[in-house]
Amino acid sequence: MKYLNTMVTFSEFPDEIALCINITNCPFHCPGCHSPELWEDVGIKLTIAELDKLIKSNRGITCVGFMGGSPIYINVLAKRIRRKYNGLKIGWYWGGSNIPSKINIGNFDYIKLGEYKKELGGLDNPNTNQRMYKIIHKISDGVMTSTTVDITSKFWKHGEK
């Protein structure tokens, strides 16, 4: 898996300062996509060492966001972050309509689902097909459970429905 570039944003994940890693070789090729440069298999290999380097060189972030990527490998990287960087949140943008079965949601704090459909708009449009989920983790009797809560409306302008 490779990435083209990174950016630090304040808007991709609510209330977070996120290091967003733009993963290439996107399989979805959504019409009207704002990042068609991510369709090709180009860029820098995203190894665990490279991920550590990116995190360490972006002090002050509160979240790492993977913008695309293979579910199996994203899950491995998310698990690594969860174990090594206490308190750092993890998000993933996935163009599929469901969370893949290979994903352990316990490794994530945010997951965005849904391919981009130009006529429905992005997360900031109340008519969007895309959904942003916050993963709520609870530990009871030593067992962690994780559930999803739809927080898509946090992206809408106040009063929109």
What is each stretch, according to the model?
Residues 60-80, 124-130, 137:
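Conserved glycine-rich "GG(E/T)P / GGGxP" loop and the immediately following alpha-helix
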Residues 105-161:
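Classical nucleotidyltransferase
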Residues 40-53, 71-106:
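Canonical radical SAM enzyme core domain
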Residues 38, 69, 115-116:
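Flexible loop residues that form catalytic
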Residues 20-33, 70:
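Cysteine-centered iron-sulfur cluster-binding motifs in ferredoxin-type domains/subunits
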Residues 1-22, 35-40, 154-161:
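N-terminal [4Fe-4S]-dependent radical SAM core
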Residues 18, 63-65, 89-91, 110:
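Structural preference for beta-strand elements that scaffold enzyme active sites
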Residues 29-38, 59-61:
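Short, basic/glycine-rich phosphate-binding loops at helix/coil junctions
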